Every structure is written in C-alpha cells, then in structure tokens.
Amino acid sequence: MKITSLKNRNLLTMNEFNQSELSHLIDRAIECKRLKKDRIFNLGLNHLNICGIFLKPSGRTSTSFVVASYDEGAHFQFFPADNIRFGHKESIKDFARVVGRLFDGIAFRGFEHEVAEELAKHSGIPVWNALTDTHHPTQVLADVMTVKEEFGRIEGVTIAYVGDGRNNMVTSLAIGALKFGYNLRIIAPNALHPTDAVLAGIYEQTPERNGSIEIFTEVAAGVHQADVIYTDVWISMGESVSVEERIALLKPYKVTEKMMALTGKADTIFMHCLPAFHDLDTEVARETPDLVEVEDSVFEGPQSRVFDQGENRMHTIKALMLETVVP
C-alpha cells in the first residue's frame, strides 16, 4: 500500500502511524542498515539540528540518536536535565516554541507522557518519544526489525513477554501487536497483569486488529510454541516498590534455559530491551542477586538477539528521523 508523506509527524506512541506506515519505517531501517554496512552515507539530514531532551538515564537510545544524526549530516545537541525545569521558571509551552524555531526535531525521554505531548503540540517540529513512563515506541521499532530479520516476517509471529506486565514496554508491544499483526502473550503474576484501564485504552486508541493480545499467569502455557521470549528488568526506572516483594512475585518468571525449552521450538529467540541483569558484573546484581531476570547462559547463548536489538535501535531511529524531519 502506498503511504502518504510522514514529514513533520511525531512518534509519541505506536498509534501515531498505521500499519503500512510502520512497515515502511521498518523497511527503511533495514535499508539504512545495509547502507551503513557498505559505508554509504547520503546525508539526508545535512545541516539540520536535532534537540535531545533526556530527563532519565539513557544509553542505547541517546547514542542511537547521536550516531544516526551524525551519519546523516545533522548536529545533535543535548539539553542537560539540570538545565530544564519545566514549570519552575519556564513553561513547557514557551520552551517548545523557542526550540521549535531553532531545531528540526526533538528526541524526548522523561517521566510524564504529557510532557512529550505538550512539546509536540507547541514546537511545530517532529517529537520522538525516546521513553516515558507509559510508552517506549522507538524500542518496539527496533524489536520488530529484529524479529523481521530473524524470521523474514512479523505477521503471525508469537512474542511471549515474561515479567512485569504493567510497564511501558508491554503497552508499546501490545499496540504494536494490533498494528503489525504479531501475537503478544503477556505472562505475569496476577498482581502484575496490565490493568483493565490500560487494556481498554489500548483497544480504544488502536483501530487495527491485525494481531492479538493474550494474558497468562502460568509460564508453560504462555511460552508454548512461542517464537520469541522477551523480558525486561523487574523494576522500571523511577518506580518505587519493595524490591523483596517484586522478587517474590517475579522469581518464577525468570528466563532460564528450561523456560526456553518449554516453547517446544528449537528456533525460539530471546530478546531484551536492555540494560539487563544477567550476571553479577553490576553493583545492583551483586547486592541483590535474586533480582537477575535472565540466566547468563540464555543472555549470552545462541538464541539471544539482544545485541541485534541494541544495534537496530540506531537504524530504526535513523529511518524515523529521515522520514519525519522536514529538510
């Protein structure tokens, strides 16, 4: 299906684009990856300026925006979190209107999703959600690209997400399922199932029904015949919860070699949006080893595609900027 121009479009949630437009972005990202491998740089963003507002820590996402910008000839400017105090001395609206006159796009990572919406409303330039408390759409673009590279398709693929079913990744993956046509199984304890309100919002705001969303409590049933087992850390950035209570809830959902075998498929892959606790090489994991959400043998094993996902963050972000920025 022919798509209309994506110029000056935002990516605040996966619902900003329809299936054809999202598929086009994935195909463009795959092409960007090929060109990068061949060291071909077309400078599609030459002499443009990209603004980076990162109010939460960021590794892969921020560097992906930086590298993608420089590859295509753009300048990327970080605004340090300490320099931005929305609502203290300057409103989001006023800040956005100035930035919109100086820059050609905004990458925003923060807490309240409403801040991203305000930036998009008043800046007049594309705003890309690099993660908020409720959505993480740029990660799902990389995930879908990784799945398509692995299986040659995304439609009909079964992704089993194991862990905290209420986080921003699950929400974005769920919208992505209805858009792209993959089947998402959310496998979590009852206390961490997505709320009825969140699920209702996903279905209400997503017109497509190309894939499915199912919720499981029992691991074996949820992962059976899954093409992908996906997990994330058990406590999200900025989340204030009892570590002991969260471990007690999610320890049965730790991704292990045994869980991978429960799929009954030899070609099941493992995915993780990173950063991950998979060994004792971090202070947090050494202090609380029971917080490790995936066995190191799975994370480092032949079924793992976590570093493909990490690389594909850059290619999908590059495609997103090339398609949406007005030159």
Swiss-Prot record:
The keyword Hydrolase does not apply. It comes from Pseudomonas savastanoi pv. phaseolicola (Pseudomonas syringae pv. phaseolicola). Homotrimer. Optimum pH is 8.4. L-ornithine binds at residues 168, 232, 236-237. InterPro entries: Asp/Orn_carbamoyltranf_P-bd, Asp/Orn_carbamoylTrfase, Asp/Orn_carbamoylTrfase_sf, Asp_carbamoyltransf_Asp/Orn-bd, Orn/put_carbamltrans, OTCase_ArgI. One of its GO terms (biological process) is citrulline biosynthetic process. It holds the Pfam family OTCace. GO terms for molecular function: amino acid binding; ornithine carbamoyltransferase activity. It is found in: Cytoplasm. This enzyme is insensitive to phaseolotoxin, a potent inhibitor of OTCase. Its main location: cytoplasm. Transmembrane segments: none annotated. The gene is argK. This is Ornithine carbamoyltransferase 2, anabolic. Belongs to the aspartate/ornithine carbamoyltransferase superfamily. OTCase family. It comes from the Bacteria. Keywords: Amino-acid biosynthesis, Arginine biosynthesis, Cytoplasm, Transferase, Virulence. Induction: By N-sulfodiaminophosphinyl, the inorganic moiety of phaseolotoxin, at 18 degrees Celsius. Pathway: Amino-acid biosynthesis; L-arginine biosynthesis; L-arginine from L-ornithine and carbamoyl phosphate: step 1/3. Its EC number is 2.1.3.3. Carbamoyl phosphate binds at residues 109, 136-139, 273-274, 313. The keyword Iron does not apply.
